[in-house]
C-alpha cells in the first residue's frame, strides 16, 4: 500500500462536504492542531498522523493532492517565526535560492501561498481559541524518502547505489557553485530520494554567495548541523569557499558506505576530536588563520593522531577507490581538497559520466549582505509576500 492510499483511507481531517467537486475543491478549510491553525484546500487530504512537526519553528505536514495525485510537504509559518530574525533570514534566503535554482532537475520544486484562518468555518481537533490570522505556506514536492532514511533503513541499497547518489550530489553542487553560491548546509535529512534513487535538494536556508564577508558568513552558521560542517567553518578560518561543500559531501559519502552516521558532532569540541581521529591532527599552519582563538588553542592541544589509516579503520568496508576519494575530500586544509571536477572524473564514476551536467551561466547574489542582515520581521514577511507568493 502506498502512502497516498494510507492518507486517503485514514481518518481524514476534512469537514463536509466530503465529495470533492470542481466547485469546492479549491475552497479553503481550517483546523487547529496543538493550538496552531492549518488552512488547506479541500483537494489536499491530511490526517493527524501526517502532521509531524508543530513547534516554534512552524507546522510541517504532508498532504495528498487529489487533483494532481502528488504528495506534498507543506510548512506553515506565522508572523511569530519571523520575529526570530534568524528564522526570518533563513526563510527569505531559502526562497531566493529555491527560485533561482528551481529549473534545475536536481532541485525540488516549491511555491509559497498566503492564507487566512479567519472567517473560515473551523473544525477543531483539539479545543483551542488560538487563531494565527494570515500565514505563509511553503509547499515542496514530496519524494519517496530522504537520504537520511535510506542510509539508516536500507543499508544494502545505500551501499549499492553509493556511486550513483554521490555522482548526482557532486554534479548538483558543482552547478550551484558555478553560480557563485556555497550551499553550506548539506545534510542527508534535506536530500530527497525517489524509488529510482534520483536525488533532489530541497533546502537552501544557509546558502550564501562567495562575495559575502567573513563576519556575515559566520553570523547565522552556528545553527547548521555540526556533523557535516567542514573544519575551517568550525575553527573559523578567515577564508572560505566551495571546498566546505566538498567536505560535507565527503561525510555523506562515508555514511553511504558505512550505513550509519560518521561523526556524532554533539559539540564543536567533540567534532574536532572525531575529525582528528579520522584524518589526523592538523598542523599549526593549517589552523593559524583561525579567527576563533578558543577553537585554535583547543585543536592545537588535541593529542597527536596519525594521518594514515584513520579512514580505513573507521570505514572498514570501503574499497581502495572509495578510500582514495575520501582522502581527497576530507582534508584539514581546504585548498588540498580535490575539486569536484577532479572527483567526478575518477574511474569510480565511469558508469555515470554519461549523465548530463549543467553549468549556471550567471552568478547570483542577495545584494548587500549588511542590508540583508538588518531586515526586521515585518520587512522579511513583506518581501516574501510581494516577491514569492504565487496564489492568494
Curated annotation (Swiss-Prot):
Binding site for ATP: 52-60, 75
UniProt KW keywords: ATP-binding, Nucleotide-binding
GO biological process, one term: intracellular signal transduction
Start and end residues of each Protein kinase domain: 46-349
Record InterPro entries: Kinase-like_dom_sf, MAP_kinase, Prot_kinase_dom
GO CC, alphabetical: cytoplasm; nucleus
GO MF: ATP binding; protein serine/threonine kinase activity
Family: Belongs to the protein kinase superfamily. CMGC Ser/Thr protein kinase family. MAP kinase subfamily.
Domain comment, as recorded: The protein kinase domain is predicted to be catalytically inactive.
Name recorded for this polypeptide: Probable inactive serine/threonine-protein kinase DDB_G0280855
Species whose genome carries this gene: Dictyostelium discoideum (Social amoeba)
